[in-house]
Amino acid sequence: MMKQINADVKPHFGEIWMCQLKGDGSIQNGYRPVFVLSNDKNNAFSTTLNVIPLTSKMNKRRLPIHVELWDYKRYGLRTPSTLMTEQTTTIKVDSLDYRIGVIGDNQTLARIKVALSIQFAVFAYV
């Protein structure tokens, strides 16, 4: 049986957590919300997980790889925010601070799925 790595922090797919990101230049950094992208099996037993950083700067160019969250309070956010799928990254679980919300509605999850499929060209080569 696999042993759970970090019993204190239990992120799940779709949740939004506050996180300290270590990026530089145009890579998102600092203390910000992130969307948990990796699956729950990975999240339960791995020391790392995949996340999508969010930004509150809504004046960026509208790209098909961005998902705007105008109904921000629904997700536990303080301001309208954008998921930036081009900034998807792997982090250590212990860099998560606390959970602020969850994106669980099918409409928004479908928009995230489309943005990810465009960013990573998942279906372009099948």
Predicted regions and their residues:
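Short, surface-exposed loop and linker segments with low hydrophobicity and enrichment for Pro/Ser/Thr
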Residues: 8-11, 42
